[in-house]
From Swiss-Prot:
Sorted UniProt keywords: Aminoacyl-tRNA synthetase, ATP-binding, Cytoplasm, Ligase, Nucleotide-binding, Protein biosynthesis
GO MF annotation list: aminoacyl-tRNA deacylase activity; ATP binding; isoleucine-tRNA ligase activity; tRNA binding
Root EC class: ligase
Domain of life, per lineage: Bacteria
Organism phylogeny: Bacteria, Pseudomonadati, Pseudomonadota, Alphaproteobacteria, Candidatus Pelagibacterales
Protein name, as recorded: Isoleucine--tRNA ligase
Matching PROSITE patterns: AA_TRNA_LIGASE_I
UniProt organism field: Pelagibacter ubique (strain HTCC1062)
Motif, 'HIGH' region: chain positions: 56-66
Binding site for L-isoleucyl-5'-AMP: 563
HAMAP family according to UniProt: Ile_tRNA_synth_type1
Reaction catalyzed: tRNA(Ile) + L-isoleucine + ATP = L-isoleucyl-tRNA(Ile) + AMP + diphosphate
GO cellular component assignments: cytosol
Length: 905
């Protein structure tokens, strides 16, 4: 063999990926072949895997969290498809709700248009058009990420079919009697003028006014309590006018103390919990006091107080009520209760027959029910209330506190609890809470900690408020009799409404006569037509009903729901309640939740901080496959960090993977030969090739186990290590000589070519769900018959590939090789030799290692010109590296004293 006849690698697969330009070409190819349609045909009739898409909101460009979510879904869908399942993916969008209303209102303000002068149906039409526009934008952005789905047949919560089914689902709750009208405190946004769900709330630090306020004892069974002030502490002074009761804990110890010279409270007696006395003394700067009496909380029974504003028109009794929620964590051990402004307060007062009244209107202003304060906005009321308390000599102390406080995640405005008439689904009346908790026990969670998180929420959540006081949403399909106040429950009316919505949408609820919906059986003048809309979480909670159950290509329940960890209180939660309430079980078999995307330091991304990275910017700089590597390599169970230094590391890993493929393709000259694994006589292969096939078999088992547990970051890590350690640093390094310098007909080279073909097919399939574009690029080079790598199935390997004894042997041989390489590198560092081929090895091994090293050519596996192996009497491996003597072969560069046998022609 002459130097000119060296088998140099040759491939059209370039070293430079150029993903930014290559990926759009592949997208066009997928569009041309209609990849999604081909996927459905290829696995038609097989077991289904249904990942039901949680609908993103149709508003604004996608962000890193959305990209993470969609890529993770796509990886899983593709894994199951290549595992032989019919893995259907139908993308969807959440379309109703406040954010879109706000956008349209902003446009109105810009154009000096008055929303109140615009017909509701026209406003809703503009909302619909806005959502439709962003759905199309999102489609393009998701496709660019490499996400494959039924884009032409997506679902949307604003579709007529969806709105009709939402009506039918509400009808089921109505029929069983668990949907009711109630007057309860709900989280309310005075900016958005509507109730909010827990999932629409975020907690931020907020500075609140604090007060220690006196409620004079009016009647008591404890003599020492006469002429005493009960002290409460609150961070919401504006709720004092709405106070109806005080709460204590019967198990706590309380103290009556007499103050010294303390201004308005000079020589007055006050009562606080013993455990909190020290903090009260400190906060209120009390200089002197004496203890009068200690007693148990249970002795408060039948005690009545007066309102601090008794002289200002608040001349009603304030009873003291026993409550377990009173603790000694903060305050005075006595809690002021305003039933219109807190769930605990409301429930306690309800228990004792004290009704909540409307004290604050939708704008956040006091109503006429509160003398003195009517018309004042509650967020401006604190100074006024504090001043009035001072005037009445009922203010012991006031201050400020920075604490975590609920805000609207949309407007960022602080929220309040406000009692309003709303529509609720009961958690208790038909056992919804129990059904939901049972369903969670039957659901798989990835990671498992998600189960306890959502369980804790279900265990403590109040009844589900499903009404909103807005216009862009599905109208509540409810009529209430004007005289009897009874809710109309009639399946025929409900189905009539649903049928109308199915044909023309729900706008007609706002424009058409009630008689059209009631039919001939009832008179419209007898009924109030409810004008509230359904909260958006009920909308999306019904997707299982109008997507999974209605489409022939899907099935109910879904195999998996996959969203961010915030959806334990959002979509996972609402879907669970809706499905358990109507079908008795969860609409999913498993839940996978992922963390949030944060910057490289672990901080929340914020435009004001300047640490936001947009998917679009990453695609322009790196391409989608680098972003997909970031998703696959990250532990989604935690928050996921990203910045350009992290992406650069992934780009470097990608280059290593790409070079691995390039080496395989180059040595095969892009002439891939599919190997029949079952008929392959593995015993005829050299030991090194047999070992590599064992590694392929072993890696495939690990791959399947990681895949089944959705442990992608360890799966990716193992694939990357196989490329860099097993292949590039080991097998490729050793076999480069045979592949380049052996004749094409040599058994050793032909055996290696067989293994390279198997490794190439294995790797391109293992990586396909992750590197969707790059593997497609490779597949077009090696397979002219099939249309796409994504239509392929994972390989199945014969058990003959598995050889544990050989594996154990090569573990030891690789250890010897590593020690030899250290010795060679030392000689190279001292300039005694150049390349390893200028070295000869003398290897001394103990008896057991010497035995397994028989018939092993260490010059081959250590890439030296020669190697001698001796048995020694010591357990230590002793390596001596000397400079090889002889002539250098111009082809293989090995140095021998005799002519190179391979290249002597």
């Amino acid at each position: 063999m002459s130097k000119e006849n060296i088998n140099l690698p040759k491939t059209a697969f370039s070293m430079k990926a150029n993903l930014q330009n290559k990926e759009p070409e592949i997208l066009e190819y997928w569009k041309k072949i209609d990849l999604y349609k081909e996927l459905r045909k290829s696995n038609k009739g097989k077991e289904k895997f249904i990942l039901h898409d949680g609908p993103p909101y149709a508003n604004g460009n996608i962000h890193m969290g959305t990209a993470l979510n969609k890529i993770l879904k796509d990886i899983i869908v593709k894994f199951h498809q290549m595992d032989g399942k019919d893995s259907v993916y139908v993308p969807g969008w959440d379309c109703h709700g406040l954010p879109i209303e706000w956008k349209i209102e902003e446009q109105y303000k810009k154009n000096k248009k008055n929303k109140n002068e615009v017909p509701i149906t026209e406003f809703r039409k503009e909302c619909r058009e806005f959502a439709e526009k962003w759905i199309e934008v999102h489609k393009t952005q998701f496709k660019r990420l490499g996400v494959v789905g039924d884009w032409e047949n997506h679902y949307a919560t604003m579709s007529f079919e969806a709105e009709a089914q939402i009506v039918r689902e509400l009808g089921k709750f109505l029929k069983e009697g668990s949907l009711y009208r109630g007057f309860k405190p709900v989280l309310w946004s005075t900016v958005e003028k509507t109730a909010l769900a827990d999932a629409e709330v975020e907690y931020q630090d907020h500075k609140s006014d604090t007060i220690y306020t006196a409620f004079p004892v009016k009647k008591t069974n404890i003599k020492e309590l006469e002429n005493t002030d009960v002290i409460i502490w609150t961070t919401t002074p504006w709720t004092i006018p709405a106070n109806k009761a005080l709460a204590y804990n019967e198990a706590l110890d309380y103290l009556i103390i007499e103050l010294g010279d303390e201004g308005d409270f000079k020589n007055k007696k006050i009562v606080v919990a013993e455990a909190l006395l020290e903090s009260v003394i400190k906060d209120c700067e009390i200089k002197s006091y004496k203890e009068i009496k200690k007693f148990k909380g249970k002795d408060f029974k039948d005690t009545i107080c007066s309102h601090p504003f008794l002289e200002l028109g608040y001349d009603y009794d304030i009873p003291m009520l026993e409550a377990r929620f009173v603790t000694t964590e903060q305050g005075t051990g006595i809690v002021h209760c305003a039933p219109s402004h807190g769930p605990d307060d409301f429930n306690l007062c309800l228990k004792y027959g004290i009704k909540a009244i409307e004290t604050v209107d939708g704008d956040g202003k006091y109503t006429k029910n509160l003398p003195l304060f009517e018309g004042t906005h509650i967020f401006k009321a604190n100074p006024i209330v504090i001043e009035k308390l001072k005037e009445q000599k009922k203010l012991l102390s006031n201050g400020e506190l920075v604490h975590s406080y609920p805000h609207s995640w949309r407007s960022k405005a602080p929220l309040v609890h406000r009692a309003t008439p709303q529509w609720f689904i009961s958690m208790e009346s038909h056992g919804l809470r129990k059904k939901a908790l049972k369903a969670l026990d039957d659901t798989k969670f990835y990671p498992d900690k998600g189960r306890e998180r959502i369980k804790a929420m279900i265990e403590t959540r109040p009844d589900w408020c499903v009404s909103r006081q807005r216009v862009w949403g599905v109208p509540l399909p409810i009529f209430v009799h004007k005289t009897t106040k009874e809710i109309l429950v009639d399946d025929n009316v409900n189905e009539n409404i649903a049928s109308i919505y199915e044909k023309e949408g729900s706008d007609c609820w706002f424009s058409d006569s009630p008689q059209r919906f009631l039919g001939d059986k009832y008179k419209a003048e007898d009924y109030e037509k409810i004008s509230d809309i359904v909260e958006v979480w009920f909308d999306s909670g019904c997707t299982h009903a109008f997507v999974l159950e209605k489409r022939e290509d899907l099935q109910w329940p879904a195999s998996m729901y996959l969203e961010g960890s915030d959806q334990h209180r959002g979509w996972f939660h609402s879907s669970l309640l809706e499905s358990c309430g109507t079908r008795g079980r969860a609409p999913y078999e498993s839940i996978l939740s992922h963390g949030f995307v944060v910057d490289g330091k672990g901080l929340k991304m914020s435009k004001s901080v300047g640490n936001v990275i947009a998917p679009e910017d990453i695609l322009k700089k790196y391409g989608a496959d680098i972003l997909r590597i970031w998703v696959a390599s990250s532990n989604y169970a935690e928050d996921l960090r990203i910045d350009y230094s992290i992406l650069e590391q992934h780009a470097d890993s990608y280059r290593k993977i790409r070079n691995t493929f390039r080496y395989l393709l180059g040595n095969l000259n892009d002439d891939f030969q599919k190997i029949d694994l079952e008929s392959l006589d593995i015993k005829q292969l050299p030991e090194l090739e047999r070992y590599m096939l064992h590694r392929v078999y072993e890696l495939n088992n690990n791959f399947k186990n990681y895949f089944k547990s959705y442990d992608f970051h360890n799966l990716y890590k193992e694939l990357l290590n196989f490329c860099t350690v097993d292949l590039s640093s080991f097998y490729f390094d050793i076999r480069k000589d045979a592949l380049y310098c052996d004749s094409k007909n040599s058994d050793r080279r032909k055996s290696s070519i067989v293994v390279l073909n198997i490794i190439l097919e294995s790797l391109v399939k293992w990586f396909a769900p992750i590197l969707s574009f790059t593997t497609e690029e490779i597949f077009t080079l090696i397979n002219k018959e099939q249309k796409s790598i994504h239509l392929e199935q994972f390989m199945k390997y014969p058990e003959s590939f598995q050889d544990e004894e050989l594996h154990k042997k090569w573990i030891e041989l690789k250890k010897i090789r590593d020690i030899c390489n250290i010795s060679i590198e030392a000689k190279r560092a001292s300039k005694e030799i150049g390349s390893s081929l200028e070295a000869s090895l003398i290897i001394n091994l103990n008896k057991s290692l010497f035995e397994i090293s028989k018939n092993v050519d260490f010059s081959e596996i250590c890439i030296t010109s020669s190697a001698l192996v001796h048995q020694s009497n010591t357990d230590e491996i002793i390596i001596k590296t000397i400079k090889a003597e002889g002539n250098k072969c111009p082809v293989c560069w090995k140095i021998n004293k005799v002519k190179c046998e391979r290249h002597s022609d």
